[in-house]
Amino acid sequence: MATENKILILGATGAIGRHIVWASIKAGNPTYALVRKTSDNVNKPKLTEAANPETKEELLKNYQASGVILLEGDINDHETLVNAIKQVDTVICAAGRLLIEDQVKVIKAIKEAGNVKRFFPSEFGLDVDRHDAVEPVRQVFEEKASIRRVVESEGVPYTYLCCHAFTGYFLRNLAQIDATDPPRDKVVILGDGNVRGAYVTEADVGTYTIRAANDPNTLNKAVHIRLPNNYLTANEVIALWEKKIGKTLEKTYVSEEQVLKDIQTSSFPHNYLLALYHSQQIKGDAVYEIDPAKDVEAYDAYPDVKYTTADEYLNQFV
């Protein structure tokens, strides 16, 4: 169904931004993308490259062919940013972790433009107001939380999107460092493997984001994506994979104490990924009760969405 809600995506060619663009187009929203004159990042982590093989140039051509309105600009260029924002109703920022704090510039531009009905700051992970993460991830979460406070203090209408674990980072390799596919012989499990995590495909994040953007009931609330068939422990995920390949994997369980040591002695991106895995698989940062006054559970709000289950997602690797 077509909608008049004009949506601008910042970070539209990134790992999650591209899925938000396609979901917006599919939903019938007039869709805009702020695009910088830059080439692809040749230093993309292997997981990111495996999940998103399409180049930036290919992506932009496909956007144009699909009706996306490309606006040349940059978060750090106030004039082009304001001009872009003035053309839309909703701004969704999917900028990477290095640009989190730069969103104060987006907020400033939104305030100047004066027409934005909703802003989605770049989160797309766990709820940054509910976590027990360690460094180096903790700093990023704290930066995201500080952006929330600026949004609220400035009176900018918002929605926070908490999607937890992308399948492209957590499921396609069963959270194995330096692997891009699920293991077939041995698997390392952080903690006891009995803590539930919330998995979701990047495409489904796009779908739920746009549903929330078009839903007045999510105004000034956080939307949580914890889908019943994807709300699983590491042991449950591994059992799904073992059933598919007809083989029992050799399992090594790593204590929290050892994981914390490994985080401290590893370099980026290993330490960052380990800290993310620690947050979900050991600390259980996807397990919490929501407050209906300020939170929305995506599955309950949009039960008609046909999401990809963890079981279905793993079929491609058999």
Curated annotation (Swiss-Prot):
Sections of the chain in a coiled coil: none
Matching InterPro entries: NAD(P)-bd_dom_sf, NmrA-like, NmrA-type/Isoflavone_red_sf, PCBER-like
EC identifiers of the protein: 1.3.1.45
Pfam hit, one: NmrA
UniProt-annotated binding residues for NADP(+): G11, A12, T13, G14, A15, I16, G17, R36, K44, R148
Active-site residues, Swiss-Prot/TrEMBL: K144 (proton acceptor)
Source organism, top-level taxon: Eukaryota
Record field: catalytic activity: (3R)-vestitone + NADP(+) = 2'-hydroxyformononetin + NADPH + 2 H(+)
Keywords linked to the UniProt accession: NADP, Oxidoreductase
Single GO biological process annotation from the record: lignan biosynthetic process
Gene Ontology MF, one: 2'-hydroxyisoflavone reductase activity
Pathway it works in: Phytoalexin biosynthesis; pterocarpan phytoalexin biosynthesis
SUPFAM superfamilies registered for this protein in UniProt: NAD(P)-binding Rossmann-fold domains (SSF51735)
Family: Belongs to the NmrA-type oxidoreductase family. Isoflavone reductase subfamily.
Functional note: Reduces achiral isoflavones to chiral isoflavanones during the biosynthesis of chiral pterocarpan phytoalexins. The reduction product (sophrol) is a third isomer, which represents the penultimate intermediate in the synthesis of the phytoalexin (+)-pisatin, the major phytoalexin in pea.
Protein name per its UniProtKB record: Isoflavone reductase
Record gene name: IFR
